[in-house]
């Protein structure tokens, strides 16, 4: 029976939404693997390295080029909205109010795993197949280091909601640290993506963006909230287009679009509702499209070994940095461990970053696969490590600094 592209596309959508949900719901995985993690894992399982190898005819039928192109369009828009929300949710005002504590903690939480990750990446430079064809060594090393250092702010919010600490003082402290790290990480990414052949365009983009931002902010404060929501999506599309045209990548533009908006322009409950619905309704398509980019050509064992090394570098670096910050700031027993395990959450933001590195051919699809596995492992460790610690030191939940 012949099927058109629309019918095959809908089969793909049926798979994307049903398979991970059924695994999550009936497998009762929520403690170790929230639905978002199950969706990412399912994306990998449905990719060319696993399903494509086991059932090549079915794989090529469902995920043919026309269907993949349609899925990619949805995935691009989904991730742009998600990244914009992450930018809006940066809490830099609170970070400034507690600037000594926030700067020390965020600096060590970022710098230590960045160094550990760069050291691990230096070990990969000498082996063929890990560094992308358009990467210089420093870009590859810094990109891997950045991936090991990043904290996934939006997923961190979801996990802290699950642990019932998001609106508590410790949750707000952790958001301050993560917000500063987010800004720094996107700055590092911009340096990595600097294209000397298009540096004029990139500088032009930054100048025009600065002027446009001033005008945009002047307009937004004069609008009613209902208009702000709609205008924010127009602004998102414009910023993403301009950044991509300049060679920085559309996701950098999406983050900048959100970062220059104030969270108090929008109702917090509506913002939470938007984030939850983007995650439920369209982000699963991004997870699938991410899984379709995985590659096991180096051999499964090599990819898993590299993923394990990067996971160790990431987690140990984050915990070491936070414990050092705790000693400097004289935190109580157990405090650094809880904060460190929460801040090492990778999930979506790291996956978004490594998608950008893959797009720019700074890493290969094998490295991308290893980093994806590292992000999954990192996120699955978070709740099982933090929940028992919170039960033992419940008084920390209410500590403000």
Residue ranges of predicted features:
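Transmembrane alpha-helical segments of multi-pass membrane transport proteins and ion-pumping complexes
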Residues: 12, 16-25, 44, 48, ...
